[in-house]
């Protein structure tokens, strides 16, 4: 992030001069209708030009935002619907550069998330915010929300947008890392199914090259004493089992995760497992990670490809 990036952020978040001095009553009326979850009143107001011109204006206490951001944060689905029908900017930013989708994800409002995505919201959130909807859903264990985001094209290898000097922090901030550390096995598996890299949760070699000693997911899972299922999933999805260095303490050999890793190192991967890896990687490279159901193969093999 450079000075030009910072200047761009502030320019986006600065309110228009005329907005600062006008429309206070209209903005308050729109926000009050959203607060009250009164979609009928909101619809009536937005049919009037004096109110509609402020549909994308940021206002309110705390974190000033648009009416759509407010509706998304409260989970007021009907208000979200009315605002979108009247042309509200689906990716409008609040003063923290967060989109309505990010706000809906943060508050766990699945139906609002689904409606915003169907209206064209960017599943990755704003490029001007350090976090992303996928990172938030992975951290919170919001499986259904994460599934919606990934199904609408969100990147499973998304990274927090940190400056170069903090890249050593970013290397361990991917959604897989968060799902593992916070113990959300279902989200962890889902991310892998959508093509998350099982080694570093990062496919940006430029970023990895700037990290002096990047830690693999296997290392992180072992360090945090994650359940053996996490280790097994990483092995099954093709993680490099020779990357992490194992502890020299003999007592650590009793750890179930380390036992799994040692067993994988000592046992050649089966031809069936290798075939599954090749097929899944080919589908991911073609951005078709969920196309297994379309393959002309027996159902039992489709289930195997989906790790079921």
From Swiss-Prot:
The keyword NADP does not apply. ANK repeats lie at residues 63-92, 96-125, 129-158, 171-200, 213-243. Transmembrane segments: none annotated. Belongs to the ankyrin SOCS box (ASB) family. Probable substrate-recognition component of a SCF-like ECS (Elongin-Cullin-SOCS-box protein) E3 ubiquitin-protein ligase complex which mediates the ubiquitination and subsequent proteasomal degradation of target proteins. This is Ankyrin repeat and SOCS box protein 12. Pathway: Protein modification; protein ubiquitination. InterPro entries: Ankyrin_rpt, Ankyrin_rpt-contain_sf, SOCS_box. It comes from the Eukaryota. The SOCS box domain mediates the interaction with the Elongin BC complex, an adapter module in different E3 ubiquitin-protein ligase complexes. The gene is Asb12. GO terms for molecular function: ubiquitin protein ligase activity. Disulfide bonds: none annotated. Interacts with CUL5 and RNF7. Residues 268-308 form the SOCS box domain. Keywords: ANK repeat, Repeat, Ubl conjugation pathway. PANTHER family: ANK_REP_REGION DOMAIN-CONTAINING PROTEIN-RELATED, PALMITOYLTRANSFERASE HIP14. One of its GO terms (biological process) is protein ubiquitination. GO terms for cellular component: ubiquitin ligase complex.
């Amino acid at each position: 992030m450079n000075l030009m990036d910072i200047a761009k952020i502030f320019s986006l978040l600065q309110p228009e001069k005329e907005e600062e001095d006008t429309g206070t009553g209209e903005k308050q009326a729109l926000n009050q209708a959203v607060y009250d979850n009164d979609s009928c009143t909101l619809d009536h107001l937005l049919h009037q030009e004096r109110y509609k011109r402020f549909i994308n204006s940021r206002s309110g206490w705390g974190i000033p935002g648009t009416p759509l951001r407010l509706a998304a944060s409260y989970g007021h689905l009907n208000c979200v619907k009315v605002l979108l029908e009247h042309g509200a900017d689906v990716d409008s930013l609040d003063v923290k550069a967060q989109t309505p989708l990010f706000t809906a994800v943060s508050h766990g409002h699945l139906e609002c998330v689904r409606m915003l995505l169907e209206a064209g919201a960017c599943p990755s959130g704003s490029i001007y915010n350090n976090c992303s909807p996928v990172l938030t859903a992975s951290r919170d264990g919001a499986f259904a929300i994460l599934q919606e985001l990934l199904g609408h094209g969100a990147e499973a290898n998304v990274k927090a947008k940190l400056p170069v000097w903090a890249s050593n922090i970013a290397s361990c901030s991917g959604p897989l890392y968060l799902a593992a550390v916070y113990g959300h096995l279902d989200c962890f598996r889902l991310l892998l199914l959508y093509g998350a890299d099982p080694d570093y949760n990062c496919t940006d070699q430029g970023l990895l090259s700037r990290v002096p000693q990047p830690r693999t997911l296997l290392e992180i899972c072992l360090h945090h004493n994650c359940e053996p299922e996490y280790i097994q999933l990483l092995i099954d999805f093709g993680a490099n089992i020779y990357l992490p260095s194992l502890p020299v303490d003999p007592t650590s050999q009793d750890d179930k995760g380390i036992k799994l890793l040692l067993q994988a190192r000592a046992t050649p991967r089966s031809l069936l497992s290798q075939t599954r890896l090749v097929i899944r990687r080919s589908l991911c490279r073609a951005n078709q990670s969920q196309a297994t159901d379309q393959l002309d193969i027996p159902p039992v093999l489709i289930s195997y490809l989906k790790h079921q």
